[in-house]
Regions:
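Edge beta-strands of extracellular beta-sandwich domains
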Residues: 26-34
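Serine/threonine-rich, repeat-prone extracellular segments and beta-strand-based repeat modules
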Residues: 2-19
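A conserved helix-loop-beta module that forms one wall/lid of the active-site cleft
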Residues: 121, 125-164
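Internal "kinase-insert"/substrate-recognition segments embedded within catalytic cores
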Residues: 95-100, 104-106, 110-123, 127, ...
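Hydrophobic alpha-helical membrane-insertion signals
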Residues: 33-78
Length: 263
């Protein structure tokens, strides 16, 4: 902390308003902004790439002045959005700088976990579409096993924050949870499959419902989908039957049965 002097005396600060501040140790005037959002600061000597994670240090000050400080691994995420100037990233909290072990951390009142997304929202001029859509979805949809798993969520929660990377301001990001077994409260494999999770990994025949390629349970990918859970066993039969129904069912059968097949 360094002493500083405002160029013009102020009695009340306003978020988003620029203030000129003189810092003697630099013998310079800087522009200072106040924000009502949490502030993230990530520093790393390494180039951040799309895998593997590189070591970095994470520090966040929440609006209640709580501070989270930890070593992390960080990498770029996304597909075509990696070509944009402002990158989305994912971070993994580490117990130390080696990354040999991860640790669960609670951020911004969201879940406690070691994996988090930092959404850049570069293609959203108002930075509201992704967050609002996810909020609306969670308010509208309840999964069919909600009664037995009241904490299960078929979606993610996101919170706004302002991000600095190596002391350079990157703009507003959304800190977000991940859709995974933990979020959905899927049961662990215990000799049989009790819940499945797939990811649409690419635009292919099955993900676009344009074709029905054959599948192999020896592969974790099929028709543009990636099999995410469980790790112990792969069975594409349920998803194959669903895609088959969408593509090949006669209209009258589709309209009679789709409501039972899609929760």
């Amino acid at each position: 902390n360094e002493p500083c002097t405002f160029s013009t005396p102020i009695h009340q600060v306003e978020a988003g308003k620029p203030y000129d501040v003189f810092i003697p140790s630099y013998n310079s005037v800087f522009t200072l902004y106040f924000t009502e959002l949490p502030i993230l600061s990530i520093s790393t000597p390494y180039e951040i790439v799309d895998e593997p994670y590189v070591q970095a240090h994470f520090r966040m000050m929440e609006t209640n002045q709580a501070i989270v400080s930890s070593f992390i691994g960080i990498q770029i995420r996304g597909g075509w959005t990696q070509t944009l100037p402002k990158k989305s990233m994912e971070i993994e909290f580490w117990t130390d700088s080696t990354g040999a072990e991860t640790q669960d951390v609670s951020l911004l009142g969201l879940r406690t976990d070691d994996d988090w997304n930092l959404q850049a929202m570069y293609n959203e001029p108002l930075r509201i579409r992704s967050k609002t859509n996810n909020d609306l979805w969670l308010s509208m949809h309840k999964i069919h096993y909600q009664q037995s798993e009241p904490d299960a969520m078929n979606g993610i929660r996101m919170k706004y924050a302002e991000l600095f990377l190596n002391h350079e301001y990157q703009g507003v990001y959304c800190v977000g949870e991940k859709i995974d077994r933990k979020q959905l409260r899927l049961k662990n494999h215990n000799g049989s499959i009790s819940g499945e999770l797939y990811k649409g990994a690419g635009w292919d025949g099955a993900t676009t419902f344009h074709s029905l390629p054959p599948y192999s349970n020896n592969s974790r990918v099929w028709g543009g989908f990636e099999y995410k859970h469980p790790d112990e066993e792969t069975d594409w039969a349920n998803l194959y039957d669903l895609v088959d129904f969408v593509i090949n069912a006669p209209d009258h059968q589709f309209y009679e049965e789709y409501d039972d097949r899609f929760e």
